[in-house]
Design a protein with these regions (language model features):
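Acidic-basic catalytic patches of nuclease active cores, encompassing PD-(D/E)XK
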Residues: 1-45
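Alpha-helix N-cap and loop-to-helix initiation/capping positions
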Residues: 13, 17, 83-91, 132-139, ...
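Hydrophobic, Leu/Ile/Phe/Ala-enriched alpha-helical segments that form helix-helix packing faces
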Residues: 21, 25-34, 96-103, 139-152, ...
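Acidic carboxylate-rich catalytic motifs and surrounding loops in phosphoryl-/glycosyl-chemistry enzymes
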Residues: 39-45, 111-116, 161-166
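Charged, often glycine-rich, active-site loop that binds/positions anionic groups
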Residues: 43-60
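Non-catalytic C-terminal interaction segments of nucleic acid-processing enzymes
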Residues: 48, 128-189
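Active-site beta-strand-loop-beta-strand hairpin of nuclease catalytic cores
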Residues: 54, 61-71
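Catalytic cores of nucleic-acid endonucleases
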Residues: 76-133
Length: 189
């Protein structure tokens, strides 16, 4: 995870970054859930019919005898997190319904795994840091854990993996974040 995070501000929309994220998250998930080690795993699996009647792309999918058993939805948010935190929460609630109500599935787990800094930079359009977001505080104000638990019991889990960006207060532009050092990285438990 640390290696991924050090370059996580680079090419934030690239498929290479996404592939790296999925690889490290699968390793984390399997370390915490060794009972899934023998499953067949696929990245970017397209579920043919979701609970809304459309298709649904699953970041990391675990199969037993060809049947989907574990769905992992991954997010790695680095900057301007607080302004998007409510949208992420709403998306999670909707995606949970799309997966759990999909016809013909007997899922063991749906994991929403987000990787986020405890403190995140806020950039303007010129790439200058205009402030720092307290992501822990924002997440506390947008806690959907009780809703997810009430709706799905333990089937759906929201897992937030936090990390610290070292020396963040000394970074002034997005260029300063191209290679970072991190510490206090949470693990999937």
């Amino acid at each position: 995870m640390n290696t991924f995070l050090t370059s996580s501000f680079q090419n934030v929309r690239s498929s290479k970054r996404t592939d790296e994220l999925h690889t490290v998250l699968l390793a984390e998930v399997l370390e915490a859930n060794p009972q899934w080690a023998g499953y067949d795993w696929q990245f970017e699996y397209r579920l043919p019919v979701d609970g809304f009647g459309g298709t649904f792309d699953i970041d990391i999918a675990g199969f037993v005898n060809g049947e989907l058993k574990v769905a992992v939805l991954a997010k790695a948010m680095n900057s301007n997190v607080n302004k998007n935190i409510k949208n992420y929460a709403n998306t999670t609630i909707g995606e949970a319904a799309r997966l759990t109500y999909a016809p013909g599935l007997d899922l063991e787990a749906v994991l929403f795994v987000s990787v986020l800094p405890r403190t995140a930079p806020r950039f303007n359009k010129a790439g200058e840091v205009v402030g720092l977001d307290n992501v822990l505080s924002a997440k506390a104000r947008t806690n959907i854990g009780n809703i997810i638990e009430a709706q799905y019991g333990g089937l759906v889990q929201v897992i937030d993996l936090f990390f610290d960006i070292d020396n963040i207060s000394e970074m002034l532009t997005s260029a300063d974040f191209q290679t970072i050092t991190v510490s206090n990285v949470d693990k999937v438990s």
